[in-house]
């Protein structure tokens, strides 16, 4: 299926980069009967969708993305027959748990009513926040996960937008209990910026919506299984994939009517800068990247011994204790500091997927936010946070593998300074990333498009950046109009 030397034939379209967005773009184009080539610099496809034995033999670790709530609610991915190509999701009983110092934990479950009820005094407030979004989601999903335009359902979109454009701290004021405030803060911190900033509520609301619609699943066998299913489906349609080929200039590529690049603005300038207008080049140079991450994978002798039993039912555990603690951690990181008690996002896939570790053994995956480009080792700080809520954790570590922001970027050039969202998701870069244009997917050069997480709707494994860019190219270049 994969080759290493580019052929000289012509193509209708070429996609550079085989992350989830590159794969989505390639599939969308190939579904229309075009001749499509997908080019990847590495020996394997997938971008952030890769699974490797990073620590010890038999221990499979997700190198980048691990838990996939956005994949299963993606309007594009959900239409693809990926199960036929080997993709099977596992749904932990609890989507996410949030432990506290007193030995208890708040939980996010697939049932909105159950989640609300467990929040006790904040039951009504939680339902008031989430019920309208879940009711409207079928109407607004495509709108939320695309570029800024006049919506087909303006009232439903307005109801969501008023909440989504808010700061996370303002949404937290809806709740009275420390537990509800903290659970919300953990969701909102996925925005990877201070919780006091406008728009930080958006990601938290979408992630909670995903939990109540489908759950927060993990692919059996590892995140690479998503890329494998997508690529196999693409080639089954007649698409061609070439690996081990790094593109540094458009001149390296065969001729094509359209080229879609699953890259950041920085790489776009390197590859196609000579074809871009001076104004568009100026816009791309102004594009801002967000905080980075420091990541650890562990091979464990036994499961993480969380004090709160609910954590043992969760695929994801948010470690940050309180709203105040998480606000402080994220603000310090934004200011260029390294928190003593960082907010930690942890996944424990092997509790639910026995293919991830040898019998009786386990894996865990975690990261914390750090200043962009930081090379500080946060291992001790992260492990202290886990140990805080799971005494005895460190005694169960058999081996570990760490990646700082520099190592993450070396592994995947789209992770600039360790930024896993493809750029800061600020008010000015939420819908207009990477530049303010009628279509953010078009560059200033005809036939050249950007389809990475640096375009709307941003980071996450959903493929919508690639799908939206491919729709734009189909309309512009091939006069093919896709409604949804």
What residue spans do the PLM features occupy?
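Conserved FAD/dinucleotide-binding core of flavoprotein oxidoreductases
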Residues: 114-117, 266-270, 299-301, 358-388
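A conserved FAD-binding loop/helix module that cradles the flavin
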Residues: 451-474
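Helical element adjacent to the flavin cofactor pocket in flavoenzyme catalytic cores
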Residues: 207-248
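A glycine-rich dinucleotide-binding beta-alpha-beta segment and adjacent secondary-structure elements
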Residues: 181-194, 341-345, 392-456
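Rossmann-like flavin
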Residues: 101-198
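N-terminal glycine-rich phosphate/pyrophosphate-binding loop and immediately adjacent elements
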Residues: 5-135
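Extreme N-terminal leader/targeting segments of oxidoreductases
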Residues: 1-13, 31-32, 429-432, 436, ...
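Mid-domain catalytic core of redox enzymes
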Residues: 243-357
């Amino acid at each position: 299926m994969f080759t290493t030397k580019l052929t000289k034939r012509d193509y209708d379209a070429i996609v550079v980069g085989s992350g989830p967005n590159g794969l989505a773009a390639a599939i969308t184009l190939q579904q229309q009967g075009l001749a499509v080539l997908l080019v990847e610099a590495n020996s394997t496809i997938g971008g952030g969708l890769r699974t490797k034995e990073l620590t010890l033999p038999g221990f499979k670790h997700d190198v980048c993305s691990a838990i996939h709530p956005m994949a299963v609610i993606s309007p594009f991915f959900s239409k693809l027959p990926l199960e036929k190509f080997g993709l099977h999701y596992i749904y932990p009983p609890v989507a996410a748990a949030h432990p506290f110092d007193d030995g208890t934990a708040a939980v996010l479950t697939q049932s909105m009513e159950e989640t609300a009820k467990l929040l006790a005094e904040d039951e009504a407030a939680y339902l008031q926040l989430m019920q309208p979004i879940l009711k409207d989601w079928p109407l607004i999903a495509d709108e939320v996960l695309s570029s800024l335009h006049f919506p087909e359902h303006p009232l439903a979109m307005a109801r969501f937008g008023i909440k989504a454009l808010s700061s996370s701290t303002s949404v937290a004021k809806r709740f009275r209990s420390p537990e509800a405030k903290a659970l919300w803060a953990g969701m909102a911190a996925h925005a990877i910026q201070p919780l006091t900033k406008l728009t930080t509520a958006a990601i938290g609301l979408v992630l909670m919506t995903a939990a109540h619609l489908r759950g927060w699943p993990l692919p059996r066998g590892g995140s690479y299984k998503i890329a494998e299913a997508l690529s196999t489906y693409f080639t089954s349609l007649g698409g061609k994939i070439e690996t081990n080929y790094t593109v540094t200039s458009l001149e390296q590529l065969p001729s094509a009517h359209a080229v879609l690049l699953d890259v950041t603005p920085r790489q776009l300038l390197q590859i196609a800068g000579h074809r871009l207008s001076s104004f568009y080049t100026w816009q791309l140079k102004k594009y801002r990247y967000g905080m980075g991450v420091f990541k650890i994978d562990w091979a464990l002798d036994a499961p993480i011994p969380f004090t709160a039993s609910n954590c043992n039912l969760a695929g994801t555990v948010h470690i940050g204790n309180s709203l105040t603690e998480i606000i402080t951690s994220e603000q310090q990181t934004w200011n260029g500091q390294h928190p003593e008690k960082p907010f930690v996002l942890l996944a424990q896939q092997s509790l639910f997927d026995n293919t991830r570790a040898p019998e009786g053994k386990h894996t865990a995956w975690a990261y914390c936010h750090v200043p962009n480009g930081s090379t500080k080792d946060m291992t001790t700080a992260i492990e202290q946070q886990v140990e805080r809520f799971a005494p005895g954790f460190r005694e169960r570590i058999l081996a570990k593998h760490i990646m700082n922001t520099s190592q993450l970027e070396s592994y995947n050039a789209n992770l600039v300074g360790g930024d896993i969202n493809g750029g800061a998701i600020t008010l000015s870069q939420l819908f207009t990333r990477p530049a303010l244009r009628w279509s953010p997917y078009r560059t200033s050069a005809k036939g050249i498009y950007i389809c990475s997480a640096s375009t709307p709707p941003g980071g996450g494994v959903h493929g919508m950046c690639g799908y939206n860019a491919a729709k734009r190219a189909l309309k512009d270049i091939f006069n093919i109009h896709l409604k949804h």
